[in-house]
């Protein structure tokens, strides 16, 4: 069905507390819609929406949808949800999160959609900050929180829209990108996709959404990405380190905290010497992608260079949470083997005596599908603690457990422990950390609570 958002006065969100859902609700509030919603628990994102005028119920209640003109639901919501069922019974139009995002994006002339298995949040944030600082007044929806824009969403008054584009359930095929960014393509979300070929096919469809005057920005160093765009009749701009590309980083050095400095060349011409304030080689790629996108939109490269240097990262992306008794606590959202590997490589360049990695696997399907890759991804850690799998949208059917991962890591000769609950991990850290240790909480669930609690209790 063709949907005109202007016709819907009251829009109800089932699962309004999610990072993307809360951002979409914020945008619609700013546009003058009445927003209601529900979730299973309260959060600072929900409290912010309530302050802005949204009416939100905890938990889900069937009567919450009565009177709504449109209902939006998130991927975590199943058909048996009481509000979803009530909306169907009442004949209220129902759309998913990605459809709504696409409808909002469609209104903007210059939509930038950042896709890829890894690096979406940081790259989206970088592009957003550069455009914001350069005076473009963009509307932004990020899958993380950035201090520079005051959260996970920013509503501008221009024709520029920047968002992350997730491939899960082919969500990004509902978008309207003027610039489609493909950072990398990796095996993930195998509860939905059958295999890597299936994933590549989805990314190719995404790249094909770009209009004839638009652009696809792609990483030349990523073989899967190059396979995705091969023969695609679109305006393609590439970036990379190893391969000769339109945008290339050369002469890379790292400072004592693992942050890179490098020279940038555009089609062989020297552009400038760039410096990052966020650690890791992977962030060179994210910076190059951001530079390529903002250049296409007319941002001066000297200005972009300045804003890239000032960028301090986003919450939960190698976020230094604090230091207590000489122990540094860092938190990272990494939940795929490639991300964990990149995060630990960044940690290696950060001052430390030992790296203690605490990992909460995210979803049973991903843990099962990539089990041996997960085991290998911790090779750079000195000590590893694995806790129970964070189920997210799934149910535990017994196909895999954290102990299976612990066994594989142990077979690689690593110092690894399984500790079930967070309180016990905190107690273990209190008794076993030394001055100079780097404690790294890793995962897309709520594992960050361990680091926060350890810091809090040690300050007493």
From Swiss-Prot:
Pathway: Cell wall biogenesis; peptidoglycan biosynthesis. One of its GO terms (cellular component) is cytoplasm. It catalyses: UDP-N-acetyl-alpha-D-muramate + L-alanine + ATP = UDP-N-acetyl-alpha-D-muramoyl-L-alanine + ADP + phosphate + H(+). GO terms for molecular function: ATP binding; UDP-N-acetylmuramate-L-alanine ligase activity. The keyword Plastid does not apply. GO terms for biological process: cell division; cell wall organization; peptidoglycan biosynthetic process; regulation of cell shape. InterPro entries: Mur-like_cat_sf (IPR036565), Mur_ligase_C (IPR004101), Mur_ligase_C_dom_sf (IPR036615), Mur_ligase_cen (IPR013221), Mur_ligase_N (IPR000713), MurCDEF_pg_biosynth (IPR050061), UDP-N-AcMur_Ala_ligase_MurC (IPR005758). Pfam families: Mur_ligase, Mur_ligase_C, Mur_ligase_M. Its EC number is 6.3.2.8. PANTHER family: UDP-N-ACETYLMURAMATE--L-ALANINE LIGASE (PTHR43445:SF3), UDP-N-ACETYLMURAMATE--L-ALANINE LIGASE-RELATED (PTHR43445). Belongs to the MurCDEF family. Cell wall formation. NCBIfam families: murC (TIGR01082). This is UDP-N-acetylmuramate--L-alanine ligase.
